[in-house]
Amino acid sequence: MLFRSAAFLINPGGDCHWAHSGDSRIYHYHNGKFMRKTLDHSYVQLLVKRGEITAEQANSHPQSNILMGCLGTETEPPVDVHFIPKLRTGDCLLACSDGVWHYFTDDEMGGVLERLSAREASEFLIDKARTRSQGGGDNLSLVVVKLEPLDS
């Protein structure tokens, strides 16, 4: 069995560390604006990196499900790490499986995360991914963390 992994940790000082392997992704938005995301450890991401196909073409590529590394294999998986110092009010982190991100653009997800609460955004993204996959999608897993101002 193969496992995809994406994880983030926010320490009490507000710093964020993330680690990623496979094709689950972590996205960082600030006030709905796309800031950064992880890159998949997949065959099509390798083709994108080489300039052989575009990111848009990768989404519909017939070999988009081939992973170059993930947890649960005999070889050591690739792990990418990233550090975000001092998250701020308006920052939002989304960790999700390919069954979610495959059906949205980065900007579309940012808009949903900006205008809805974390719970409402999670429900909307899951429901919309189910609809768009027409019953043929992958697993749907996600976690949303939004930094909102404290009530005074």
Regions found by a protein language model. Name each.
Residues M1-L2:
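Short, small-residue-biased leader/transition segments that mark boundaries at the very start
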Residues A6-A7, D15-H17, A55-A58, H82-P85, ...:
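A generic local secondary-structure boundary/capping motif
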Residues A7-P12, H28-Y29, V143-E148:
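Short hydrophobic alpha-helical segments used for membrane anchoring or interfacial signaling
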Residues R25-H28, Y43-L46, Y103:
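A short local loop/turn or secondary-structure capping micro-motif enriched for an aromatic residue
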